[in-house]
Regions:
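Phosphate-handling DNA/RNA-contact segment within nucleic-acid enzymes
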Residues: 13, 28, 103-122, 132, ...
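N-terminal structured subdomain of primase-like DNA metabolism proteins
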Residues: 1-102, 159
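Terminal amphipathic helices with adjacent charged low-complexity linkers/tails
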Residues: 95, 103-104, 149-150, 154-156
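Periplasmic/cell-envelope proteins involved in peptidoglycan metabolism and beta-lactam response
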Residues: 22, 114, 125, 132-143, ...
């Protein structure tokens, strides 16, 4: 990311607005605001924000910095990810000096919105009478009730060629956008849904945005793979994603422990059993990028203090 873009983000992102998304701030006088620190347990507010200087500081745990470092710390993001998050927040187009270009802010938002709406569509379909019953029965056979399915956003992809495509095109998305988002693919007579007659799990990046899906076949007559994932897209990079991480990140950082299990239902079962540090890979082997992501959650004062359990 170009230095002038970083400088622009740092100086135009109001730190009190950004912090205010996580902390209830109150005026503290002298141009400062204060609230309960999000980085340690406390009953009296010792977390201060100075909007005029763009800095925050906690007098309890001695953490502090600017708006970028705040997002890095609270969302467990890298520097680049934090800058990109803030750029998205203010709809600012970043430029890059070298390396692969990132999907433009407006394009990225369209892809994220398409996936968000797709997740809601699939969730609604799971509750419909008829063909979705096989999906509900599968979940019940694994010990998951309606509340569990809702907690993890599990859905059902209808056994139709273009049910999702029609739904999203009715909301203004184009065939090109839906294919780029990994939701449809080119068929013999136009674009068709990528997932059909499958149980679907939304896959989130660490920030919580839905970036793709994992889908399990429900019919023995389905000759496709047992599990099918969103293909690589501008927002879905399977080597850098862990299923359940957006739910587990706070507990992982707090307990200095992460439990890596095999699949989506294993993550569900673990969390419902109280093991809230469980995550799983998304149809790929556990690799270096996954380790890099988890190290950020398990680091304490630049030292690795935690355990990874398989």
């Amino acid at each position: 990311i170009r230095d002038d873009d970083v400088s622009h983000i740092r100086h135009t992102s109001r730190i009190d607005d950004v912090v205010g998304d996580y902390v209830q701030l109150k005026n503290a006088g002298g141009g400062q605001k204060k609230g309960l620190c999000p980085f340690h347990d406390e009953k009296s507010p010792s977390f201060h924000v100075t909007p005029s200087k763009g800095f925050y500081h906690c007098f309890g745990c001695q953490t502090g910095g600017d708006v970028i470092s705040f997002v890095m710390k609270i969302e467990h993001m890298s520097f680049t990810e934090a800058v990109e998050r803030l750029a998205d927040r203010m709809n600012y187009q970043l430029t890059y000096d070298e390396g692969p270009t990132r999907t433009g802010g407006s394009d990225r938002k369209r892809l994220l919105e398409a996936n968000r709406l797709a997740a809601l569509f699939y969730q609604e379909q799971l509750q419909q009478p008829g063909p979705a019953q096989v999906g509900r029965e599968f979940l019940q056979s694994r010990g998951f009730d309606k509340a569990a399915a809702a907690k993890f956003g599990v859905g059902y992809a209808p056994d139709e060629w273009d049910a999702l495509a029609k739904h999203l095109k009715g909301r203004g998305f184009t065939d090109a956008e839906l294919e780029l988002a990994g939701l449809t693919k080119e068929g013999q007579r136009g674009h068709i849904d990528r997932f059909r007659n499958r149980l679907v799990w939304p896959i989130h990046e660490i920030s919580g945005d839905v970036v793709g899906f994992g889908a399990r076949r429900l019919s023995e007559s389905d000759t496709g793979p047992k599990y099918l994932n969103t293909p690589e897209t501008p927002i879905y990079k399977k080597s850098a994603l862990l299923y359940g991480l957006e739910m587990a990140k706070k507990e992982i950082a707090k307990k200095r422990q992460v439990v890596v299990v095999e699949g989506y239902t294993d993550v569900m079962a673990a969390h419902l059993a109280g093991i809230e540090t469980a995550v799983a890979t998304c149809g790929t082997a556990f690799g270096d990028e996954h380790i890099r992501i988890l190290r950020r959650l398990l680091m304490d004062d630049d030292a690795f203090r935690g355990e990874v359990i398989f």
